[in-house]
């Protein structure tokens, strides 16, 4: 049997077993760590690559993460509002190195402390909940106390600047990323290689065969992972029908990052989703000191997408990327870094060549104009401008952020370019983060406020407003990382 078929089956078996025992292990570990460390003799000074398997495990590292997340959405007058509060925790363990090899595993569980009935659509617009359900299991709204997932189970080899990791892991790529804006992140299952052959060059390559999107508890093949979230409407104006209808053997990723000059870097990415579409990105960024206190920053970005074969399905009604379709995106950023300020003005343009498409299940937009709680996936002929400013109060261990953007979208009835029937809108994000010190070091508290409203004076039917515009979203998050 081909290795690309054997490995997913093996890791799926491991996932099933680990999901059943992870919560028990987490509980036992929490209550026995103190006693274990008191009763065991002092370990011998660690030695690298010892022949002792016991040493490999004892020299491993544990990391924990507990999170409290409370969210509420205040929709336009007459539309249903929502609120939810979740709590969760997880553990990660990585063994010590044995001739460069190590094993890592980690998992997470979530509980619903209190929430609105997230299964009820708004009675006026018939729109379903969009934000709060993401704290839990988006596929099973009734699941409140059995939300757990094996997130990491991998074998890693590292030698100097070369690292290869195979198995379940967390992503960090422009188009497939953790999008950690709910309780847990998106995970990937595959092979990733990182190599830095020189001081100024970084290479990355990967082959992915499964993805576990944020707000889910299962692992899905690449085709299955597209369409788990609401999928909007097709270019023909009919509801998108590609869920469980796409075929793909996996995702191939390659990138190079080059430091051209101390003040200039360039990165090139190519992401090929077999049988569906290809995405290429070139991004250049610079940082030029103006004086001892001030640095000029900026960047340029170009993205090109093209359909592969029939875009995922030979039936046009069930395909993801229209046969022969393409999209082009370009953007830029210019800013000043003057401690404690970091300010930038950003621009994104999606041309009329076609919809920019990237599964929302896979990650957030890489655009300079991105602000939390909204995406520009699914749109064509878009112009966006955003101002971002952050201010660090080092003595108060705090950081403030302000983001304001205007996003000019096609008409809501222009189905060829407006997949989610969203009006042009303006968005304001305000956030505050505080890092605790001393006894509570490792804990932070964050507050995020988001408001979106229609641009212009045009009136819209409720179905174009609910959970989209003329609404506010409130978030209170507490993290403890140890």
What annotation goes with each model-predicted range?
Residues 52-73, 101-105:
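Transmembrane beta-strand segments of Gram-negative outer membrane beta-barrel proteins
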Residues 62, 99-103, 161-165, 200-203, ...:
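Repeated loop/turn-to-beta-strand initiation elements of outer-membrane beta-barrel proteins
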Residues 64, 89-95, 153-157, 191-195, ...:
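Residues on the lipid-exposed face of transmembrane beta-strands in outer-membrane beta-barrel proteins
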Residues 68-72, 107-113, 159-161, 168-173, ...:
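Transmembrane beta-strands of outer-membrane beta-barrel pores
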Residues 94-125, 140-221, 258-263, 345-351:
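Outer membrane beta-barrel
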Residues 113-117, 204-254, 294-367, 451-469:
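Outer-membrane beta-barrel translocator/channel fold
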Residues 178-185, 211-214, 246-248, 270-281, ...:
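Solvent-exposed loop/turn segments connecting transmembrane beta-strands
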Residues 468-482:
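Outer-membrane beta-barrel "beta-signal"
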């Amino acid at each position: 049997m081909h290795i690309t078929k054997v490995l997913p089956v093996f890791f799926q078996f491991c996932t099933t077993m680990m999901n059943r025992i992870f919560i028990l292990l987490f509980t036992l570990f929490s209550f026995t760590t103190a006693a274990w460390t008191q009763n065991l003799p002092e370990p011998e000074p660690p030695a690298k690559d010892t022949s002792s398997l016991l040493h490999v495990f004892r020299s491993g590292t544990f990391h924990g993460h507990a999170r409290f997340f409370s969210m509420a959405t205040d929709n336009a007058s007459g539309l249903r509002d929502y609120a939810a509060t979740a709590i969760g925790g997880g553990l990660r363990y990585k063994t010590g190195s044995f001739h460069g090899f190590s094993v890592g595993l980690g998992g997470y569980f979530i509980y619903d402390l209190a929430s609105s009935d997230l299964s009820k659509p708004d009675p006026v617009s018939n729109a379903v909940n969009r934000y709060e359900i993401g704290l839990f299991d988006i596929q099973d709204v009734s699941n409140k106390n059995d939300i757990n997932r094996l997130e990491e189970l991998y074998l890693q080899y590292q030698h100097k600047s070369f690292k290869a990791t195979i198995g379940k892991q967390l992503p960090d790529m422009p188009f497939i990323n953790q999008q950690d804006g709910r309780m847990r992140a998106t995970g990937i299952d595959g092979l990733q290689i990182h190599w830095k052959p020189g001081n100024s060059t970084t290479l990355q390559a990967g082959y992915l065969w499964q993805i576990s999107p944020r707000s889910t508890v299962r692992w899905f093949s690449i085709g299955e992972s597209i369409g788990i979230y609401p999928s909007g409407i097709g270019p023909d104006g009919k509801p998108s029908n590609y869920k469980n209808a796409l075929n793909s053997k996996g995702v191939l990723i390659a990138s190079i990052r080059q430091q051209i000059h101390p003040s200039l870097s360039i990165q090139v990415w190519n992401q090929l989703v077999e049988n569906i579409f290809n995405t290429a990105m070139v991004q250049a960024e610079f940082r030029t000191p103006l004086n001892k206190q001030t640095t000029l920053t900026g960047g340029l970005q170009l993205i090109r997408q093209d359909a592969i074969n029939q875009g995922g399905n030979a039936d046009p009604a069930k395909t993801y990327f229209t046969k022969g379709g393409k999209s082009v995106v370009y953007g830029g950023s210019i800013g000043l870094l003057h401690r404690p300020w970091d300010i930038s003005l950003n621009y994104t343009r999606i041309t009329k060549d076609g919809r920019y498409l990237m599964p929302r299940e896979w990650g957030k937009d890489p655009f300079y104009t991105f602000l939390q709680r909204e995406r520009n996936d699914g749109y064509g002929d878009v112009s966006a401008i955003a101002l971002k400013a952050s201010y660090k109060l080092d003595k108060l261990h705090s950081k403030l952020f302000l983001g304001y953007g205007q996003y000019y979208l096609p008409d809501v009835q222009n189905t060829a370019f407006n997949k989610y029937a969203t009006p042009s809108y303006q968005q304001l994000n305000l956030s505050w983060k505080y890092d605790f010190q001393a006894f509570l070091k490792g804990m932070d508290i964050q507050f995020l406020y988001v408001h979106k409203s229609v641009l212009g004076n045009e009136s819209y039917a409720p179905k174009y407003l609910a959970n989209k515009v003329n609404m506010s979203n409130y978030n209170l998050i507490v993290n403890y990382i140890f």
